UniProtKB/Swiss-Prot annotation:
This is Halocidin subunit B. Heterodimer with subunit A; disulfide-linked. The keyword Cell wall biogenesis/degradation does not apply. Antimicrobial activity against S.aureus and P.aeruginosa, possibly by attacking the bacterial cell membrane. Its main location: secreted.
Amino acid sequence: ALLHHGLNCAKGVLA
């Protein structure tokens, strides 16, 4: 769950 959240957060910030 944490890993998924980190990837999602990074993608959201980058996008």
